[in-house]
């Protein structure tokens, strides 16, 4: 095999691992955000509106992470900078 084929194959494997890690990280993040929000609401019910606002803000920030990773992954797949 030539170097071009090896680079393309390694990039495809790496991007697959990166996509899986981004999805797993997003799922873990959602779980942590919601569990801590429920704990906070249970502990102090009068803080519910503030906790929900903060939850949605941080959930939106956390949800943008997989989309950024998706863009970088597709960039490496279709416009691979390592192929020169």
Swiss-Prot record:
The chain crosses the membrane at residues 13-33, 56-76. PROSITE patterns: ATPASE_C. GO terms for cellular component: plasma membrane; proton-transporting ATP synthase complex; proton-transporting two-sector ATPase complex, proton-transporting domain. The record marks 63 as: Reversibly protonated during proton transport. GO terms for molecular function: lipid binding; proton-transporting ATP synthase activity, rotational mechanism. Keywords: ATP synthesis, Cell inner membrane, Cell membrane, CF(0), Hydrogen ion transport, Ion transport, Lipid-binding, Membrane, Transmembrane, Transmembrane helix, Transport. It comes from the Bacteria. F(1)F(0) ATP synthase produces ATP from ADP in the presence of a proton or sodium gradient. F-type ATPases consist of two structural domains, F(1) containing the extramembraneous catalytic core and F(0) containing the membrane proton channel, linked together by a central stalk and a peripheral stalk. During catalysis, ATP synthesis in the catalytic domain of F(1) is coupled via a rotary mechanism of the central stalk subunits to proton translocation. Key component of the F(0) channel; it plays a direct role in translocation across the membrane. A homomeric c-ring of between 10-14 subunits forms the central stalk rotor element with the F(1) delta and epsilon subunits. This is ATP synthase subunit c. It comes from Acidithiobacillus ferrooxidans (strain ATCC 23270 / DSM 14882 / CIP 104768 / NCIMB 8455) (Ferrobacillus ferrooxidans (strain ATCC 23270)). The gene is atpE.
């Amino acid at each position: 095999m030539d170097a071009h084929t090896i680079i393309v194959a390694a990039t495809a494997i790496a991007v697959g691992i990166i996509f899986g890690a981004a999805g797993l990280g997003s799922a873990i993040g959602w779980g942590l955000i919601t569990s801590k929000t429920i704990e906070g609401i249970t502990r102090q019910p009068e803080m519910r509106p503030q906790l929900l606002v903060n939850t949605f803000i941080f959930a939106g920030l956390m949800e943008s992470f997989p989309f950024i990773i998706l863009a970088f992954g597709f960039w490496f797949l279709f416009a691979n900078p390592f192929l020169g």
